[in-house]
């Protein structure tokens, strides 16, 4: 969690202490059925199974399936035992109870967003000096392929950040996991989805929490404010939000932080906080170099995306002509796929959002392509909000 309002003043962590962030290492989800969740990402989104731990590897209380597409890695973890049985497994008792509590409170969701760093000790010690809440101290895990150092701190809600140093490891994922090489049987019948890496990871906060959380990222991890919009920029007839993008010192890791703003009805941020029962990760943006192929193939695999109205493209065509911007991609193809467009004088952004991945309207995925554009689609926020409000109306939560 972010520090309380009456916490002592923290001194910003110094970039010299923080070394370089290398990017997102992985995103760790707690889910009710990890095997089935992994199958969703494999069949619907073109991920591949890369590692596993469970009963067959000696893990008697929890199972984890690791899937990957490009440099995007998800760990999906589920409990194998009930809370009542937890005491039978002292090594995993605390973890087992934590997973059950997380699932009861939030449903399936992101527990940890892990960053790869050059030196765990430097980043972690700087964070601790500046008031980070420690979940686990620096520890080393090893096997015949070497060792990985890691440490974990808390961020907003019950979400955590694990710092990972991989320089001493040559294995495919992490000690304690069995590597998987079997190709899913459906892959030969389905089009390939080429994704590159995680572009950003968005956290939703409750009312008036955004500034406090952003301050926490600044002072604990040395992040800076990269981009922001307020409720005057992002609003519809019914709802609004505020957003600040926090970035690592070298701008490789970006963590947008959202909060609701006053509107006539419940916004998507309020809906998220209500159903997730607190702050947490709202969506993960996955970067691709060819969004037309990616969306075409994701839709062919059955991934569901939001619908964009015809009027959006009528307006966009006028805006592009006024700007004198010519897209590399065919406009009618983008329109047929519901791909959103944003631009400035330097370049443009193409993006589209899936529908929620779970029955609870909480987490979803963004597919994004950047063409010399470092923004976050502010020009599309209204269209996105209106699309989500149509879904909210169907759920009866636009109240």
Curated annotation (Swiss-Prot):
GO terms for molecular function: 4-hydroxyphenylpyruvate dioxygenase activity; metal ion binding. Its EC number is 1.13.11.27. CDD domains: HPPD_C_like (cd07250), HPPD_N_like (cd08342). Coiled coil: none annotated. Its cofactor is Fe cation. Residues 23-166, 197-355 form the VOC domain. InterPro entries: 4OHPhenylPyrv_dOase, 4OHPhenylPyrv_dOase_C, 4OHPhenylPyrv_dOase_N, Glyas_Bleomycin-R_OHBP_Dase, Glyas_Fos-R_dOase_dom, VOC. It catalyses: 3-(4-hydroxyphenyl)pyruvate + O2 = homogentisate + CO2. It is an enzyme of class 1 (oxidoreductase). GO terms for biological process: L-phenylalanine catabolic process; tyrosine catabolic process. Keywords: Dioxygenase, Iron, Metal-binding, Oxidoreductase, Phenylalanine catabolism, Repeat, Tyrosine catabolism. The keyword Cytoplasm does not apply. The keyword Metal-binding applies. It comes from the Eukaryota. Binds 1 Fe cation per subunit. Transmembrane segments: none annotated. Fe cation binds at residues 200, 283, 366. Belongs to the 4HPPD family. This is 4-hydroxyphenylpyruvate dioxygenase. It comes from Coccidioides immitis (strain RS). The lineage of its organism: Eukaryota, Fungi, Dikarya, Ascomycota, Pezizomycotina.
């Amino acid at each position: 969690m972010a520090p309380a309002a009456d916490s002592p003043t923290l001194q910003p962590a110094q970039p010299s202490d923080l070394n370089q962030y290398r990017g997102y290492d992985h995103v760790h989800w707690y889910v009710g059925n990890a095997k089935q969740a992994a199958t969703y990402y494999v069949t619907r989104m073109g991920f591949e199974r890369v590692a596993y731990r469970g009963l067959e590897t000696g893990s008697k209380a929890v199972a984890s399936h690791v899937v990957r597409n490009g440099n995007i890695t998800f760990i999906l973890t589920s409990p194998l035992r009930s809370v009542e049985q937890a005491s039978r497994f002292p090594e995993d008792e605390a973890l087992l109870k934590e997973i059950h509590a997380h699932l009861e409170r939030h449903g399936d969701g992101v527990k940890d967003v892990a960053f790869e760093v050059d030196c765990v000790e430097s980043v972690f010690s700087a964070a601790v000096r500046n008031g980070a809440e420690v979940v686990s101290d620096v520890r080393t895990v090893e096997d015949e392929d070497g060792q990985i150092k890691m440490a974990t701190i808390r961020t907003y809600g019950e979400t955590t950040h694990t710092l990972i140093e991989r320089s001493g490891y040559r294995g495919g994922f992490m000690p304690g996991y069995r590597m998987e090489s079997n190709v899913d049987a459906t892959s030969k019948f389905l089009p390939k989805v080429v994704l590159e890496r995680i572009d950003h990871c968005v956290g939703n906060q409750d009312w008036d929490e955004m500034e406090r959380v952003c301050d926490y990222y600044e002072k604990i991890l040395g992040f800076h404010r990269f981009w922001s919009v307020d409720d005057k920029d992002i609003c519809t007839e019914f709802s609004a939000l505020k957003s600040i993008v926090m970035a690592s010192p070298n701008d490789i890791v970006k963590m947008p932080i959202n909060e609701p703003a006053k509107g006539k009805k419940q916004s998507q941020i309020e809906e998220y906080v209500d159903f997730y029962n607190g702050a947490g990760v709202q969506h993960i943006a996955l970067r691709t170099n060819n969004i037309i192929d990616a969306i075409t193939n994701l839709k062919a695999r059955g991934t569901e995306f939001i619908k964009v109205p015809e009027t959006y493209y009528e307006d966009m065509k006028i805006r592009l002509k006024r700007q004198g911007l010519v897209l590399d991609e065919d406009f009618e193809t983008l329109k047929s796929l519901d791909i959103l467009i944003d631009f400035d004088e330097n370049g443009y952004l193409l993006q589209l959002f899936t529908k929620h991945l779970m029955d609870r309207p909480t987490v979803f995925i963004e597919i994004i392509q950047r063409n010399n554009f470092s923004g976050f689609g502010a020009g599309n926020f209204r269209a996105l909000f209106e699309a989500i409000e149509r879904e909210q109306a169907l759920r009866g939560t636009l109240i």
